[in-house]
Amino acid sequence: VFVPCGGVQVRCSPLRAVENFLDIAHFPFVHTGILGEEPHTEVAPYKVEIREDVDEVWATQIGFHQPQAAKSATEAIETQYEYRVPAPTTAVLYKTCPPKPASWDVIAIFVQPVTDQTCIAWPWMALYDEVSEYADLLQFQQEIFLQDRSILENQKPTLLPLDPRMEIPTRCDLTSVVYRRWLKRKGATYGAQTTAA
């Protein structure tokens, strides 16, 4: 099933919106009962790289406990994730499909910059789901995104810091660290704070 989810305006840097999409550590706290839950809060070590041959960021070998990995999920599962960032304002997620565990569901976000601190996020999903109604699939994704929006609109600084001295990451932030390094290497400035104040 292909599900275009429509555009959602967000008062944040377009780069912050992409970075949030890549962050799994917030799942138990922001998407409680859906994409995560306590006490399953640990992010196990995973692999992140800049694939030089295609100039993309890839995060692989990610596993995370999810109470409801998709609308089609009937029980909690250990979900496998792979993230791909082919462009600064585009990210693609391949994740375990609950009804077909050997296959991937695909969720993508295309972020349209409006200003350096405002954007429109255009998510879509390609899923194996033969039981859910289209409206239910759309509502499931919109619920998750609206939970994210309240976090995104309150992050400080509003621009995404690219100077590693501006924020102190932890091990679970590895995808963000590599994404920011990749953006800096590409000379990204729009929506970014490039130096410490």
Which residues fall in each region the model found?
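C-terminal catalytic domain of Rieske-type non-heme iron oxygenases
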Residues: 1-197
